[in-house]
UniProtKB/Swiss-Prot annotation:
Entry GO CC: actin cortical patch; actin cytoskeleton; Arp2/3 protein complex; cell cortex
Subcellular location: Cytoplasm, Cytoskeleton, Actin patch
PANTHER family hit by this protein: ACTIN
Annotated organism of origin: Saccharomyces cerevisiae (strain ATCC 204508 / S288c) (Baker's yeast)
The protein, known as: Actin-related protein 2
Sequence positions bearing N-acetylmethionine: 1
Description of how the protein assembles with itself and partners: Component of the Arp2/3 complex composed of ARP2, ARP3, ARC40/p41-ARC, ARC35/p34-ARC, ARC18/p21-ARC, ARC19/p20-ARC and ARC16/p16-ARC.
Length: 391
């Protein structure tokens, strides 16, 4: 593999995104799932798509009702290494069609607060199984900032498995202030399944998960004014949308459209005892050094698929202003206009981490000393990972 053209691999709980350094978009994006058929071999003939013993990504997604599905990653962290290696094989050899990964370079992403053992095992597999010549592991939130051309700011990175609030100052993650919220895209989908079930639509949490995820992506939004939207939903049909299911049935979705993503702001709705994303963001910035707070408030960057809901940026801004008003100004309106917030919601934020990784990998492509080399790994082992900087 050409060592001057590094691979960029952004592995998320929900989707794997893979491509080359310097690109504006991943070449391939596929669900981070591994499926094994539930049916016995003789029953498989009745299924239109031929079932293999192991199916990965989109091919597994298409026939998921016949499969036992495994998610190798939970909350951004690799839990099942055997299946993770199957995902990597699929990404490198089936999707990218690399003849070999030997001596190539790869930039991998990881969530903030990723256990060190996780990072260590990732490097070990890349060197010892795939024989890469150079490996670099970058923190997702920092890459999202790079994609925006910033080196300081607060990243609200909400993916499928976990939401992180990460303050970064001059490219260094302020890890003591990083907050993790265990509510993200997957929880919103599950919550939507429960809300629709209460209305009498029978959805199965596993087989219909993908269908409901698509309903969520098409119809859900974050409410700016909950009372107003609830009143509208109760008294009018203004919010009702029809959605055609894959089997041809049509369902009507009304107040569930804003009730499902509300769990990001009120985690108690999905039995998570944590403050919502607005309050967590406020607490994070307020815990930072007083000298950098205003620069952090002016550079809040949304990243990840679960930050794509219409209405999310304005609701976040509203919550920050309300919290500032009540907790800092003690309800004195005279100084409220001094509080400046800027929330950046770039249209490509679903792929922000990949884009930032592609930028960084292309800057580093010819700078061999910046990568962790196979030789360094063999000589020093895990202690060589200090190369990736503070975490």
């Amino acid at each position: 593999m050409d060592p001057h053209n590094p691979i960029v691999l952004d592995q998320g709980t929900g989707f794997v995104k893979i491509g080359r350094a310097g690109e504006n978009f991943p070449d391939y994006t596929f669900p981070s799932i591994v499926g094994r058929p539930i049916l016995r071999a003789e029953e498989r003939a009745s299924v239109a798509t031929p079932l293999k013993d192991i199916m990965i990504g989109d091919e597994a997604s298409e026939v998921r009702s016949y499969l036992q599905i495994s998610y190798p990653m939970e909350n951004g962290i690799i839990k099942n290494w055997t299946d993770m290696e199957l995902l990597w094989d699929y990404a490198f050899f089936e999707q990218m069609k690399l003849p070999s990964t030997s001596n190539g370079k790869i930039l991998l992403t990881e969530p903030p607060m990723n256990p060190l053992k996780n990072r260590e095992k990732m490097c070990e597999v890349m060197f010892e199984k795939y024989d890469f010549g150079g490996v670099y592991v970058a923190i997702q939130a920092v890459l999202a900032l790079y994609a925006q051309g910033l080196s300081s700011g607060v990243v609200v990175d909400s993916g499928d498995g976990v939401t992180h609030i990460v303050p970064v100052y001059e490219s260094v993650v302020l890890s003591h202030l990083t907050r993790r919220l265990d509510v993200a895209g997957r929880d919103v989908t599950r919550h939507l399944i429960d809300l629709l079930s209460r209305r009498g639509y029978a959805f199965n949490r596993t087989a219909d998960f993908e269908t409901v995820r698509q309903i969520k992506e098409k119809l859900c939004y974050v409410s700016y004014d909950l009372d107003l939207d609830t009143k509208l939903a109760r008294e009018t049909t203004a919010l009702v949308e029809s959605y055609e299911l894959p089997d041809g049935r049509t369902i009507k979705v009304g107040q569930e459209r804003f009730e499902a993503p509300e769990c990001l702001f009120q985690p108690g709705l999905v039995d998570v005892e944590q403050p919502g994303v607005g309050e967590l963001l406020f607490n994070t910035v307020q815990s930072a050094d007083v000298d950098i707070r205003s620069s952090l408030y002016k550079a809040i960057v949304l990243s990840g698929g679960s930050s794509m809901y219409p209405g999310l940026p304005s609701r976040l801004e509203k919550e920050l202003k309300q919290l500032w008003f009540s907790r800092v100004l003690h309800n004195d309106p005279s100084r409220l206009d001094k509080f400046k917030v800027r929330i950046e919601d770039p249209p490509r934020r679903k792929h922000m981490v990949f884009i930032g990784g592609a930028v960084l990998a292309s800057i580093m492509a010819d700078k061999d000393h910046m990568w962790l080399s196979k030789q360094e790994w063999q000589e020093s082992g895990p202690s060589a990972m200090t190369k990736f900087g503070p975490r």
